[in-house]
Amino acid sequence: MKYIKKHIQCAVLGMLVLSGCQSYQEDQSRRSKMAQFALNHPVAAQVIGMEDEGLINMTSNATRFAERTGLDDKANGDSRGTQVNAVRQALWQAAIASKFDSIIAEKAGNARLTDMELREGKDDYFSRYLADQAVDQRNNRIGRSIGSAKPDSDMKTLAASILFYYNKVGLWTASEVNNRWHIKQEKLSDGQYAEALKNIAKLDQNGMTEQERNSYKTGTLSEIKRSVKAIRQVED
């Protein structure tokens, strides 16, 4: 009871501070932007959720699908600018745009970015973190386009669409070149594409195996606690 009361007080305070705000400030922290998004779009925020391997929401689902494609996630460390990161971001935004719309998806995406400005034509960066932000922005945009064209699609269908686009057109990744970070749009080979499709074929619409699905237990209070914990761990 004490836990719930504490977070109700925090929510009320947040509403007083952020109510009426529809756009983010340039120097606004990620935590603040995420709280603002949740206040302005509570239904979408609940469906999108926070990443947790034990939860079913768009964010967790996108991570499960991406990690289980079998694509590379080790090239740069911390899943920054990798193939898995590209699929995760594009699928996440596609799912939001498909369920809601591209505007909601863009707001959700920007809430989790430190730098919201997409610098067209800038392919070289001084740090891995900045390069990762740049590829996320581009993959987010691709995902929104795919999701908007497939309204009310389940995430397994969207995952297949993302992989198809990756194979035919390409997604954005980052790599270190001469002590700088370079971003580029690359295609999956036909072999990588076929293998990734095979790997996700055995998953359900939430990216879970049959065993995971059978053992999954939902609980609103438990999910709220885990989401709050995940938000606290967000680095600004």
Label each PLM-derived region with a short phrase.
Residues 82-160:
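Catalytic toxin/effector domains delivered as secreted proteins or via bacterial secretion systems
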Residues 23-106, 210-236:
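Glycine-rich short-loop/terminal segments
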